[in-house]
Amino acid sequence: MAPTKAAILAFQDDIKERFLRGEIRHPIHLCDPGQLDHLLPIFEDIQPQDWLFTSYRGIFHWLLKGVPPERLLKFIVEHGTMGFCDKERRIVSSAIGGGCLPIAVGGAMGLKRQGGKERVWV
């Protein structure tokens, strides 16, 4: 079951507060809360077998793709928001703005050549 809008925003607020208290000592990149309204209908179409390529500003994406909040929190506390990837959920992130685009194109081409039914989302 997908997390609610309220739960996602509360998670991000918690990250912000932890950062301000000095509990997170790595760079964090928060999302504009208004983006969530646009993402919710898109993520209704994203299936578990689909691949998601995103950036360092992917808190909403990661939660909507099914990453357990406690796992994501642990990663962010230890490493910040850059570089989170999850092979099991087929999530690839890049710390470089736009850096995942060529990787996503290659992944999509590979899936198409193999006749796969998975989709690639960027």
Can you name each region flagged by the protein language model?
Residues 1:
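Conserved two-metal-ion catalytic palm core of "right-hand" nucleic acid polymerases
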Residues 13-17, 22-122:
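Cofactor-binding active-site loop characterized by glycine-rich and histidine/acidic residues
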